[in-house]
Swiss-Prot record:
<dbReference type="GO" id="GO:0019886">
    <property type="term" value="P:antigen processing and presentation of exogenous peptide antigen via MHC class II"/>
</dbReference>
<dbReference type="GO" id="GO:0002250">
    <property type="term" value="P:adaptive immune response"/>
</dbReference>
<feature type="region of interest" description="Beta-2">
    <location>
        <begin position="127"/>
        <end position="220"/>
    </location>
</feature>
<dbReference type="GO" id="GO:0006959">
    <property type="term" value="P:humoral immune response"/>
</dbReference>
<comment type="function">
    <text>Binds peptides derived from antigens that access the endocytic route of antigen presenting cells (APC) and presents them on the cell surface for recognition by the CD4 T-cells. The peptide binding cleft accommodates peptides of 10-30 residues. The peptides presented by MHC class II molecules are generated mostly by degradation of proteins that access the endocytic route, where they are processed by lysosomal proteases and other hydrolases.</text>
</comment>
<feature type="disulfide bond">
    <location>
        <begin position="47"/>
        <end position="111"/>
    </location>
</feature>
<protein>
    <recommendedName>
        <fullName>HLA class II histocompatibility antigen, DQ beta 1 chain</fullName>
    </recommendedName>
</protein>
<dbReference type="InterPro" id="IPR036179">
    <property type="entry name" value="Ig-like_dom_sf"/>
</dbReference>
<keyword id="KW-1064">Adaptive immunity</keyword>
<keyword id="KW-0256">Endoplasmic reticulum</keyword>
<feature type="domain" description="Ig-like C1-type">
    <location>
        <begin position="129"/>
        <end position="217"/>
    </location>
</feature>
<keyword id="KW-0491">MHC II</keyword>
<dbReference type="Pfam" id="PF00969">
    <property type="entry name" value="MHC_II_beta"/>
</dbReference>
<dbReference type="InterPro" id="IPR003006">
    <property type="entry name" value="Ig/MHC_CS"/>
</dbReference>
<feature type="disulfide bond">
    <location>
        <begin position="149"/>
        <end position="205"/>
    </location>
</feature>
<feature type="topological domain" description="Extracellular">
    <location>
        <begin position="33"/>
        <end position="230"/>
    </location>
</feature>
<comment type="similarity">
    <text>Belongs to the MHC class II family.</text>
</comment>
Length: 261
């Protein structure tokens, strides 16, 4: 698995970077440029990790007015020009032994160092998702509908959501939202399935995530209107029974108090 991380550069390296920039801007080549009154100079450093620190790549990019003109890549271990603006600076930095050695060392002092810091917080953080299923509207059997599988409050972002109908995976009619950031280091996603439910159909939302030892599966069963009515009637009867039972207990309690007086 590959992982990319923007750098948290230690104070000493930040100072070295600023010194490098100032040195670059003070070189004869830089002085000879016809720079506009307002310009933007950017320095970006990125670490790329594959299978933890099994393979690490360090890339620094130098950008002038939103155009990258030179870079250092740890795979080649020297500065390279990207545009015609880059050769003078790349050649100058490569000629500075101290600059080149320090940049090469940052593969360990920055990338691997930061990886160990992040390992205890960001990289090992796990939050299990909550999964629910709901139809987009109440419809009778044999009518087109949309089932929505809501997968919420999970971290990290990698997740796999699949739909099954009667234990057979559904691949057509599946629509997903982009991954949504909640703003609290968790994510959510909605995965919809277009379907026409038949009596007895069982739809399953199957979710795989790094926080789970086993996938989460949530089922939704297609029911006829008569079955739904019977279920609602049963629930209604149960609630009414509880109400009458409560009233009976209250009346009995009050009558017992009256006899005692």
């Amino acid at each position: 698995m590959s992982w990319k991380k923007a750098l948290r550069i230690p104070g000493g390296l930040r100072a070295a970077t600023v010194t490098l920039m100032l040195a670059m801007l003070s070189t004869p080549v830089a002085e000879g440029r016809d720079s506009p009154e307002d310009f933007v100079y950017q320095f970006k450093a990125m670490c790329y990790f594959t299978n933890g620190t099994e393979r690490v790549r360090y890339v620094t990019r130098y950008i002038y007015n939103r155009e990258e003109y030179a870079r250092f890549d740890s795979d080649v271990e020297v500065y390279r020009a990207v545009t015609p603006l880059g050769p003078p600076d790349a050649e100058y930095w490569n000629s500075q032994k101290e600059v080149l050695e320090r940049t090469r060392a940052e593969l360990d002092t920055v990338c691997r160092h930061n990886y160990q810091l992040e390992l205890r917080t960001t990289l090992q953080r796990r939050v299990e998702p909550t999964v629910t299923i709901s139809p987009s509207r109440t419809e009778a059997l044999n009518h087109h509908n949309l089932l929505v599988c809501s997968v919420t409050d999970f971290y990290p972002a990698q997740i796999k959501v699949r739909w099954f109908r009667n234990d057979q995976e559904e691949t057509t009619g599946v629509v997903s939202t982009p991954l949504i950031r909640n703003g609290d280091w968790t994510f959510q996603i909605l995965v919809m399935l277009e379907m026409t439910p038949q009596h007895g159909d069982v739809y399953t939302c199957h979710v795989e995530h790094p926080s789970l030892q086993n996938p989460i599966t949530v089922e939704w069963r297609a029911q006829s209107e008569s079955a739904q009515s019977k279920m609602l009637s049963g629930i209604g009867g149960f609630v009414l029974g509880l109400i009458f039972l409560g009233l009976g207990l209250i009346i009995h309690h009050r009558s017992q108090k009256g006899l005692l007086h």
